[in-house]
From Swiss-Prot:
GO biological process: division septum assembly; FtsZ-dependent cytokinesis
Identification of the protein by name: Cell division protein ZipA
Endpoints of the signal sequence: none
Residue ranges annotated as Cytoplasmic topological domain: 26-328
Annotated spans, Disordered: 43-82
Residue stretches of biased makeup (Polar residues): 57-67
Membrane topology label: Single-pass type I membrane protein
Chief location of this protein within or outside the cell: membrane
Protein family per UniProt: Belongs to the ZipA family.
Gene3D superfamilies registered for this protein in UniProt: ZipA, C-terminal FtsZ-binding domain (3.30.1400.10)
InterPro entries: Cell_div_ZipA, ZipA_FtsZ-bd_C, ZipA_FtsZ-bd_C_sf
Domain of life: Bacteria
Keyword Cell membrane assigned: yes
């Protein structure tokens, strides 16, 4: 065989090896996005939806409810809530936990034990200062001077004397200055900043409130209205400049395996949910991109009647949102 034939064969083998390696790497990357998707099933969605409906019910029941189709008002009896035995037990346990609380100041002994002195709270001690001797008239208050004069049995000091009142005013001014200095010298609590996440993925889940599934046509329309484009790996991506040529800020994948959207059957499929994910570091500002992804998730939740969950499959409330923002 001549040299040209050998080179052609070697090139073909190398090309096939590159293609196989690329397909294998692509499948491995996809599996990272959806490891947690297997945890979702129909049963868990149904139970979570019932829990969400119970949480969403108002505490106060209106006096009249309406029949679903007839709009006929039905009077509802007003009942007074009676605490159950479980609530009384919880109250006793919380009361016991309060007894175990001890209030203390740093570098000092506890000044108040709620368990041992519940009915006799100790008043906080005031700082004691060494005042001048009793010979100095200005060191005594007006009431002390009058009491001393009555005890001694002489006419005493004239409390209406202008000189005495000037001295008392100066003493009061000095005491206030001492209090101000003490307040400025109080130790301040040290705050430790949490480390920021610089690599990996940040994810949010969106599932239906009820046991039903998301309609594919409505889901696709809502995603396109928010600027998502179906692109690489058959997923929807939010680009920087709303064009496929610009970098991807974050993406949306199908919660059902293999996590893709069939481009030829988008109007006829249903899904149990979708997942938002953003890879760190992201193009531009991580915090701004994360806020944009959260707004997109909230908008889709309102349009599709869905519920947003965290990576731990908990309700994405205001506290969870602040925790997410603190990560970047």
């Amino acid at each position: 065989m001549d040299l040209n034939t050998i080179l052609i064969i070697v090139g073909i083998v190398a090309l096939v090896a590159l293609i196989v390696h690329g397909l294998w790497s692509n499948r491995r990357e996809k599996s990272k996005y959806f490891d947690k998707a297997n945890k979702f099933d129909r049963t868990s969605l149904t139970s979570r939806s019932h829990t969400q409906e119970e949480m969403a019910q108002p505490n106060n029941i209106s006096p009249n409810t309406y029949v679903e189709n007839g709009h006929t008002p039905i009077p509802q009896p007003t009942t007074e809530k009676v605490p159950s035995e479980a609530e009384l037990i919880d109250y006793r346990q919380s009361d016991k936990s309060v007894d175990d609380i001890k209030i203390s100041i740093p570098n000092t002994q506890p000044i108040y034990d709620m368990g041992n002195h519940r009915s006799e709270p100790i008043q906080p001690t005031q700082p004691q200062y060494d005042m001048p001797t009793a010979n100095n008239v200005a060191s005594m208050t007006l009431e002390q001077l009058e009491e001393q004069s009555r005890n001694i049995g002489f006419n005493g000091i004239n409390s209406s004397s202008p000189e005495l009142r000037v001295q008392l005013a100066e003493l009061s001014h000095e005491e206030h200055q001492v209090d101000y200095n003490l307040s400025f010298n109080e130790p301040k609590a040290e705050t430790t900043a949490q480390p920021k996440q610089t690599t990996g993925y940040i994810q949010l889940y969106l599932i239906p409130k009820s046991s039903e599934e998301f309609n594919g046509a409505k889901l696709v329309q809502a995603l396109e209205n928010l600027g998502f484009i179906l692109g690489k790996d058959e997923m929807y991506h939010r680009h920087l400049d709303l064009s496929v040529a610009s970098p991807v800020l974050f993406s949306v994948a199908n919660l059902e395996q293999p996590g893709t959207f069939n481009a030829y059957n988008l109007a006829e499929f249903n899904t149990i949910g979708i997942v938002f994910f953003m890879q760190l570091p992201s193009p531009g500002n991580n915090l701004a991109n994360l806020r944009m992804m959260m707004r997109a998730a909230h908008t889709l939740a309102e349009d599709l009647q869905g519920v947003i969950l965290t990576e731990e499959q908990e309700i994405f409330d205001a506290n969870a949102e602040q925790a997410y923002l603190a990560r970047v």
